[in-house]
């Protein structure tokens, strides 16, 4: 499956139980969050329980398709659980990028390369990574051509772009709502279809079937009710590839 939707809240609970069973849970405990808030301990509040389903789906996909030595990049890596869990699974070439300057306080900074910067304009060489992840990133200030162009440039041919986004089949109006200083989008079915077609222009194609069906609004945030969609694309060579192979930006 290349596109899946979190159908029920219980599926998210089951995913967290599986993450914990496998020893891959890095969500910061509440008492540690208190220490961070009072600045007794410096650190990042990692992970969200609400993101259990898409994090697990991403980990499973990478385990099945990517070797442990493949270079992997996480977009929007600040507070993301993905790289921590991949490190625990034995993946050895991990990089995270985010605009947040406190990114370097993330766990395993001795083993994971953290880069402060804009993931839509990076200095990574062409075709550096075998997989790129983006958990709940695209809905914030989304600009399809800019993001897909850069992802395609950084990905090796045959590499994967895996992530999730806020979703509901019918349009959820978020006009005038900003999150992290950026416009926020809850993608509709039509918008998600358009996103997939935009990605194709940059050689990023679905790896399997697409399922847009949703049955339960599993998330309530900022007075909006919706769920999550998870996706997996693979980079292929396409005629008239718009990526400039001589440019790193």
Residue ranges of predicted features:
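Core SAM-dependent methyltransferase catalytic element
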Residues: 210-249
């Amino acid at each position: 499956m290349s596109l899946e939707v979190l159908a029920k809240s219980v599926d998210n609970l089951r995913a967290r139980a599986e993450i914990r069973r496998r020893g891959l849970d890095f969500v910061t405990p509440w008492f540690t969050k208190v220490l961070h808030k009072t600045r007794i301990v410096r650190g990042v509040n990692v992970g969200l329980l609400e993101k259990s389903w898409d994090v697990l789906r991403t980990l499973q996909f990478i385990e099945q398709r990517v070797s442990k030595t493949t270079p992997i990049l996480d977009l929007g890596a600040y507070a993301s659980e993905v790289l921590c869990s991949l490190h625990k699974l034995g993946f050895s070439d991990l990089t995270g990028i985010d605009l947040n300057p406190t990114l370097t306080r993330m766990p395993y900074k001795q083993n994971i390369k953290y880069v402060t910067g804009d993931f839509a304009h990076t200095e990574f060489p062409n075709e550096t990574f075998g997989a790129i992840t983006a958990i709940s990133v695209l809905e914030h200030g989304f600009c399809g051509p800019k993001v897909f162009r850069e992802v395609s440039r950084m990905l090796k041919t045959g590499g994967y772009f895996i992530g999730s986004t806020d979703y509901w089949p019918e349009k959820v109006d978020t006009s005038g709502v900003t999150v992290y200083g950026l416009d926020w989008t809850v993608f509709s079915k039509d918008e998600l279809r358009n996103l997939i077609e935009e990605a194709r222009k940059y050689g990023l194609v679905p790896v399997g079937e697409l399922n847009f069906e949703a049955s339960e609004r599993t998330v309530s945030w900022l007075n909006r009710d919706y769920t999550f969609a998870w996706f997996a694309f693979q980079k292929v060579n396409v005629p008239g590839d718009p990526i400039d192979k001589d440019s790193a930006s």
